[in-house]
Amino acid sequence: IDENYRTKKTRKNTFIGGSSCGGLMSLYASYAYSNIYSKAIVVSPYILESMDAILNDINHQNIQKNTSIYLSWGSNETSLMHEFVWQTKACTSVGNALSKKGVKVFYNVIPDGRHCEEDWEKECDTFLPFLVL
C-alpha cells in the first residue's frame, strides 16, 4: 500500500478495523501488533468462544502506549437476550483487560443494533472521528 499510495507511514497514522470476524481479527492485531497499529475499530466482534484465550493473550502482551480501541456491539445482535448479556460481559471483560494494560477503550453499545452491515454502516459517523481524536 505504501508503495502505491501516498500514506503517512507512522504508527500514529496506522489503524485497523473490522466487524464480526474482522472485528475479532482487528482486536487481535491491535494488541499483538501494537507496534504497528495505534488505533482499532472493533465492531460486533464475536469473542464469546475465544474469550479465555483472548484474555490470556492480552495478559501476556507488551502493548504500546497510546493504543486506542473503539469497541461496539448491538443490543439486538441475536434474538436471545441472554446472548446480549454474555456478549456485553465478554466485551467489557476484554476491554477491562486492555485498560489494565494502558489501552484506551471506547465502548459503544448500540440500542437495537443488529449483527449486520446495514447497522454497522450507521456507526461510521461515530467511529470515523475516533480515528482522528
Question: Where on the chain are the PLM-derived regions?
Answer:
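Non-catalytic cap/lid and distal C-terminal segments of serine-dependent acyl enzymes
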Residues: I1-L133
